[in-house]
Amino acid sequence: MLGNHQIIRADGRKVDELRPVRITRHFTDAPEGSVLIECGNTRVMCTATFTPGVPRWRKDSGLGWVTAEYSMLPRATAERTDRESVRGKIGGRTHEISRLIGRCLRGVIDMKALGENQIQLDCDVLQADGGTRTASVTGAYVALVDAVNWAEKHRHIKSASRVLKDYVSAVSVGVINGTPMLDLPYIEDSQAMTDMNVAMTGSGTFIEIQGTAEHRPFNRAELGTLLDLAEKGNKELQAAQRAALSLD
């Protein structure tokens, strides 16, 4: 069951195959970093804003700060949802995903090399078909790199290569009808017995593993298979990041 790679999914992929990934840099003009990431039918705009100075609680520490915000457009999904700003309250899911993105990016930044400067990432989901948080991490990293390179060019930091310690990306995995699969679209995610999001660095270490059993508990063998799938997917996503960043 765990090694079955002959199953063909509804979208024609193998169980260990990513959806088509496209990363477009310089998607908008104003931000220091701006990326559109497309993972299948999921599309997220990720922007990075570099600001000299840090929040009050970080002042005089000699350290920088990286933070993130996540949101979805009202019609990113099949049915319209009100903007959270209109409702007057940021939802728990939004807070959770924003913190996830921030943690993943901070995990590959040398805050001392960044100095007392702040980089804010904004991840706005234009179209959602599963994996929006993982696409946000993967796209936001590329926007972050562009912002750090901008800061070096404008002499806000000494060395971009010192600030950027490693790559980071994230991907979803899950167990569907007893079979572990990589990179779940919404139709699979909604049926998953186990759903997991895994963020990894370019050196193969983990920053985040979020895993939940929905319909039945998962066993140790399935966990190992899911992590193997996530490692494969993240290596391929980081190859896509490198390819996008090599275009200048």
UniProtKB/Swiss-Prot annotation:
The keyword Repressor does not apply. Keywords: Nucleotidyltransferase, RNA-binding, rRNA processing, Transferase, tRNA processing, tRNA-binding. It catalyses: tRNA(n+1) + phosphate = tRNA(n) + a ribonucleoside 5'-diphosphate. InterPro entries: ExoRNase_PH_dom1, ExoRNase_PH_dom2, ExoRNase_PH_dom2_sf, PNPase/RNase_PH_dom_sf, Ribosomal_Su5_D2-typ_SF, RNase_PH, RNase_PH_bac-type, RNase_PH_CS. HAMAP family: RNase_PH. Homohexameric ring arranged as a trimer of dimers. This is Ribonuclease PH. It comes from Bifidobacterium longum (strain NCC 2705).
